[in-house]
Amino acid sequence: MNSQRLCPVYRKWLQLHPANARAHRLSLQIQAQEAHQQGKSAFARDKCYQAFETAKVVLTALQPVSKSNITTAYNDIISFGALGMYLSSLLQRAYKKHEAHEVLQECQQLLIAVMPLHAANPSVCRLISAVQHCVDSKGLPPNTLPMPNVACH
């Protein structure tokens, strides 16, 4: 899935300013939830897509990986997984099952891709595995994606 819901220039700016991107992600998530509660499904999906893309930008932004910012890494991973599952749910309700599946698959692929970045932090690796399991149980058929080849203990 190659969604382009964010302006490429803005996406680049978010990559360079992850703290601002986190605030933007939260704002978009709130807008999506409010729109969903008000019955504005299309608007909710659009805002959720933007929040999901922003979460993806934050997760892949070059940031120092250390024991001092583990809480930030936890929040980024949980937000990404939760937004992916929420977006998938919104898409399924709109009878866009293929798109919903693609979102979950993208979640899985990105979580696998970022695992090696956190190999020095076993608790972060365990969290990534737990989020992968949640995404898996949300709707991906078994064996859709290969298991990560990085060992985290």
Regions found by a protein language model. Give the residues of each.
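Extended HEAT/HEAT-like alpha-solenoid repeat tracts in very large eukaryotic scaffold/adaptor proteins
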Residues: D76-L87, V131-D136
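Amphipathic, well-ordered alpha-helical segments in soluble domains
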Residues: S27-L28, T54, S79, G84, ...
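Structural signature of alpha-solenoid helical repeat junctions
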Residues: A23, F43, T72-S79, E99, ...
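N-terminal alpha-helical interaction modules that lie
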Residues: M1-P64, C125-H153
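Short, charge-rich amphipathic alpha-helical segments embedded
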Residues: Y49-N75, Q109-N121
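A structural signal for the main folded, soluble domain(s) of proteins
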Residues: L28, I77, S88, Y95-K96
